[in-house]
Amino acid sequence: MKNSDKPAATTSDIHQEETPQVCSYEGSDYQEVFWDTGERRYEDAVEEVALKRLMPKHGKLLLELGAGAGRNTPRYAGWERIVLLDYSRTQLLQARERLGDSSRYVYVTADIYKLPFVSGLFDGATMIRTLHHLSDANTALTNVRRVLGEEAVFILEFANKRNLKAIARYLLGKQKWSPFTKEQVEFVALNYNFHPKTVRKLLKENQFLLKKQITVSHFRINVLKRRVKHELLVALDSLFQHTGSIIQLSPSVFTKSITSGRSSRSEDDAFFACPICDTSLPEARENQTCPGCGHVWAYEDGIYEFRINPES
């Protein structure tokens, strides 16, 4: 096709090109296969221990980034309201089925690189098993910081590039990439491992003050999970989590940070912000036409649709 024959790019097309590719779980049986079968019972249990240690017991408005089917949401029982955000609509439909239509929960499909909220809205945020899928971690964290208020808590989990298994494989010549270099490694398409120092640097550059880091899933080895009693393995991991303040050699690392610096906050009662033009929008449980750009944002099946180009 000649350039003159190409249709003009729409506003949505332009914004879509500006954002990095996302890893979508649309239509996936991830929750059922990965978690509900019990195969990852150990990982689920030790992550619960980590969250109990890091999360404030009480809070007002929490943003759960990469919420998926709501596996972790019940663990934030002390928070008054929780916004479950995921790129996959089908995952959020599962979350809604599990959690219900309580006014305590707000379900939002959106791109983490284009968060549809006014600045300084949230008192806290979690990002568990999500940074793992982000090619541009810096842009994502910049967006997260924008929507958080002053002294807000941020719980971030990341897949650790410098874990014992990766170190052993590298030293034995069974792995090409080095676990000691600072750049993130993409071992499968849109699946990334990060060096702990790189994550700490990104947090600092985006006005997050690191308060605590703990290591998780030290015994993520199939033979151990099969042969060692589940409760014992979880108890051992719980003990080893404290070593994260000294060194991080586990496959998963949890961090707790507090926002630093000033946070801008919308003067009106707006909740959402148009991902295309940033115009403030109310929290209305109905379709909304943005007064700034005219884009219609849908509300269907209890889910707010804020993906610029939603999947068919």
Protein language model features and the residues they cover:
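Conserved class I S-adenosyl-L-methionine
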Residues: K2-H58, Q91, V153-P179, I308-S312
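Acceptor-substrate binding/catalytic loop of class I
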Residues: W177-T198
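Class I SAM-dependent methyltransferase SAM/SAH-binding core
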Residues: L63, A67-K114
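Short catalytic micro-motifs in class I SAM-dependent methyltransferases
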Residues: R129-H133
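A conserved beta-strand element that flanks and buttresses the S-adenosyl-L-methionine
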Residues: T126
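A C-terminal cap/extension of S-adenosyl-L-methionine-dependent methyltransferases
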Residues: G173-K176, K201, K212-S280
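A short glycine-rich, Lys/Arg-flanked "PGG" loop and its adjoining helix->strand segment in the class I
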Residues: N138-V153
